[in-house]
Amino acid sequence: MSGPNPNKQPVELNRTSLFWGLLLIFVLAVLFSSYFFN
């Protein structure tokens, strides 16, 4: 049981970091677009 857990954790962390990175880029794009439109 202790085998699959550590193996699965890095993949989950990688996916979460990727998701947060995309979210951050999206938020930055929205902020920049609103700034330029203003």
UniProtKB/Swiss-Prot annotation:
Compartmental location: Plastid, Chloroplast thylakoid membrane
- Name a single GO biological process: photosynthesis
Its placement in the membrane is given as: Single-pass membrane protein
Tell me the superkingdom of the source: Eukaryota
Q: List the disulfide bonds.
A: none
User: Which parts of the chain span the membrane according to its record?
Assistant: 17-37
> Which Pfam family, an example, fits this chain?
PsbL
Per its database record, what is this protein's job? One of the components of the core complex of photosystem II (PSII). PSII is a light-driven water:plastoquinone oxidoreductase that uses light energy to abstract electrons from H(2)O, generating O(2) and a proton gradient subsequently used for ATP formation. It consists of a core antenna complex that captures photons, and an electron transfer chain that converts photonic excitation into a charge separation. This subunit is found at the monomer-monomer interface and is required for correct PSII assembly and/or dimerization.
HAMAP family attached to this UniProt entry:
PSII_PsbL
Q: What is this protein called?
A: Photosystem II reaction center protein L
The species this protein belongs to is Rhodomonas salina
